[in-house]
UniProtKB/Swiss-Prot annotation:
The gene is nadA. GO terms for cellular component: cytosol. The lineage of its organism: Bacteria, Bacillati, Bacillota, Bacilli, Bacillales. The keyword Disulfide bond does not apply. InterPro entries: NadA, NadA_sf, Quinolinate_synth_A_type3. This is Quinolinate synthase.
Length: 367
């Protein structure tokens, strides 16, 4: 069986849901929500489709959703409208009596897949051999539970785009150097904002198993994993220059998963929560070019018709893995619960969850 066939087998939704029209699907979703009541909790990430996010009991960015999962001790079922690592995080932070479900198991994250724990352990061995015990690992929540466990085991913590500066500052209070993974751009942008020079950063290439950079490696303060977000890689300086030339009154706001060059050229940079709040608080008639996932950009356009909002990249498409959570899969997961069947349960092994929770709790204690 090839990889494509294995991937297709992850989707075992009955055919009947694929042929239902939207009105029927929405009616069925409402019926199950009413039936299960407080036994059901539906968190939704800002990048989710409107057809799904309308049923969310709470929406947020990665930090907000982690906090919600940690505080929720009432719901029996948590149907997570996000991607795999978010559902894993929810399972880690909730009790054994609670069940976490991901409507479509194909909803992964390409960035999280750019680092596996075996690569990370080899990198750590090489880096600690060179730098000794002067390094602390920090991992973006966009990562597997196994890597979070590795970080927790080695005294580190998780970070989100909302609290990255606070967490990097904390890490520097613990050790001289930081090993930041898997998103090199968030790590670089955050460290630079805190005064770390580009010549004080280096990149670890997991395939070459080498440290890469232009500075003196003995003076390196931040070691970045060579990973990135496939969505935010599609924003570039040329797009900003085009906005400056054709729409000079337009402000550019981007997510810190964008490259350093893009963040430096933008007017504002911050998490999804920051972007949402900035647009919400902006003056009527203001003009904005937003560099982040398209579902969120489209939602902001709809919610703020008094402002001129466009995507920084006119050819941008939504995050393909976030888009896996669609209305048919969502309703199938809900109706299965109403019939007493759990589909697509996300379960993190206890020994992994224990150490991963250490990394998450260190972050949440500072949040």
């Amino acid at each position: 069986m090839n990889v494509l066939e294995q991937f297709k087998q992850l989707d075992n939704m009955p055919e009947q849901y694929k042929t239902m029209d939207r009105d029927e699907l929405e009616a069925r979703a409402r019926a199950v929500k009413e039936q299960l009541g407080r036994r059901l909790f539906i968190p939704g990430h800002h990048y989710q489709k409107d057809e799904v996010i309308q049923f969310a009991d709470a929406t947020g960015d990665s930090l907000q959703l982690a906090q919600l999962a940690a505080k929720n001790n009432e719901a029996e079922y948590i149907v997570f409208c996000g991607v795999h690592f978010m559902a894993e995080t929810a399972d880690i932070l909730t009790s054994e009596e609670q069940t976490v479900i991901l409507p479509d198991l194909r909803a992964g994250c390409s960035m999280a897949d750019m680092a596996d724990v075996f690569q990370v352990e080899r990198a750590w061995a090489a880096l600690t051999d060179r730098f000794g015990e002067t390094i602390l690992p920090l991992v973006y929540v966009n990562s597997t539970a196994a890597i979070k466990a590795f970080v927790g085991r080695n005294g580190g913590a998780t970070v989100t785009s909302s609290n990255a500066q606070k967490m990097v500052a904390w890490a520097f209070s613990q050790k001289e150097r930081i090993f930041f993974l898997p998103d090199q751009h968030l790590g670089r942008n955050t460290a630079y904002a805190l005064g770390v020079g580009l010549d004080e950063m280096a990149v670890w290439d997991p395939y070459e198993e080498t440290l890469q950079g232009n500075g003196d490696f003995d003076k390196v303060k931040v070691i970045l994993w060579k990973g990135h977000c496939s969505v935010h890689e599609n924003f570039n300086v040329r797009q900003i220059e085009h906005i400056r030339q054709t729409k000079p009154e337009t402000k550019v706001i981007v997510h810190p998963e964008c490259s350093w060059d893009v963040v430096q050229q933008a007017d504002y940079a911050g998490s999804t929560k920051y972007i949402i709040e900035t647009i919400r608080n902006a003056s009527p008639g203001s003009r904005w070019a937003i560099g982040t996932e398209m579902n969120l950009v489209n939602r902001l356009m709809h919610e703020h018709p008094d402002k001129e909002i466009i995507s920084l990249n006119p050819y941008m498409c939504p995050c393909l893995t976030m888009n896996r959570i669609d209305l048919p899969h969502f309703v199938w997961a809900l109706e299965s619960l109403s019939e007493g069947t759990v589909v697509n349960r996300i379960t993190v092994p206890k020994e992994v969850a224990f150490e991963a929770k250490l990394a998450l709790e260190r972050m949440l204690a500072l949040a």
